[in-house]
């Protein structure tokens, strides 16, 4: 009986050490998730500033379209796609952190169930109190992660909507650029025709 109680106490001590490790892992995941959240917030601010920049520089872009419009539009389009892709990668990383926390809690509950069964042979009240404290703390951290996840879902949705609007603006600018090129081509042809007519008239007058 003495050996059995000693073994149970040893197991309880091992469980407490694992709980501390799990708590440290959960804290690390929360810190990483908070960093991801800050990055997404910064990207949202950058994405929100894009429409204002397009409105302020609309006339400049029309002037620039006379020179290298296709290259400029392609560069802007590539930057937007890169931002959207990075947002999606951040969201995937957050989901992985949530899955890791759920796995930690699952193992934690299993260990505590084993400890509660062992409680029949020895009083494990201090360990159970530690379980309640750690469980509440980890549950709170999971709630925080879920809240961050919801914020990031909304941020990704807003980024998608913003991307569609910017795509429409780019398409409109490309269409305007095409029309300007056509007008320029027509004007050049008309000018050339007038020039040729003038030369023919002058030639006939000399004769």
UniProtKB/Swiss-Prot annotation:
InterPro entries named among the record's database cross-references: SIKE
UniProt keyword list: Coiled coil, Cytoplasm
GO biological process: negative regulation of hippo signaling
Main localization (coarse): cytoplasm
Name of one Pfam family that matches: SIKE
Coiled coil spans: 70-102, 162-193
Summary of subunit composition and partner proteins: Interacts with IKBKE and TBK1 via its coiled coil region. Interaction with TBK1 is disrupted upon viral infection or TLR3 stimulation. Interacts with CDC42BPB. Interacts with SIKE1 which mediates association with the STRIPAK core complex composed of PP2A catalytic and scaffolding subunits, the striatins (PP2A regulatory subunits), the striatin-associated proteins MOB4, STRIP1 and STRIP2, PDCD10 and members of the STE20 kinases, such as STK24 and STK26.
Family designation: Belongs to the SIKE family.
Protein name, as recorded: Suppressor of IKBKE 1
Source organism: Pongo abelii
């Amino acid at each position: 009986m003495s050996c059995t109680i000693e073994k149970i106490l040893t197991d309880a001590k091992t469980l407490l050490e694992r709980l501390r490790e799990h708590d440290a892992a959960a804290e690390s995941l929360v810190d990483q998730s908070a960093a991801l959240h800050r990055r997404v917030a910064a990207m949202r601010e950058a994405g929100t500033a894009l429409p204002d920049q397009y409105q302020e520089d609309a006339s400049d872009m029309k002037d620039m379209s006379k020179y290298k419009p296709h290259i400029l539009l392609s560069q802007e389009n590539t930057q937007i796609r890169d931002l959207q892709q990075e947002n999606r990668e951040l969201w995937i990383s957050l989901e992985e952190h949530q899955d890791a926390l759920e796995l930690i809690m699952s193992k934690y509950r299993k260990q505590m169930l084993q400890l509660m069964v062992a409680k029949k042979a020895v009083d494990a009240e201090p360990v159970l109190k530690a379980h309640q404290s750690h469980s509440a703390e980890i549950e709170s951290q999971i709630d925080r992660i879920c809240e961050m996840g919801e914020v990031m879902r909304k941020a990704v949705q807003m980024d998608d909507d913003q991307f569609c609007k910017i795509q429409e603006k780019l398409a409109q600018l490309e269409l305007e650029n095409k029309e300007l090129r056509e007008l320029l081509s027509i004007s050049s042809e008309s000018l050339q025709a007038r020039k040729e007519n003038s030369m023919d008239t002058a030639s006939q007058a000399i004769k």
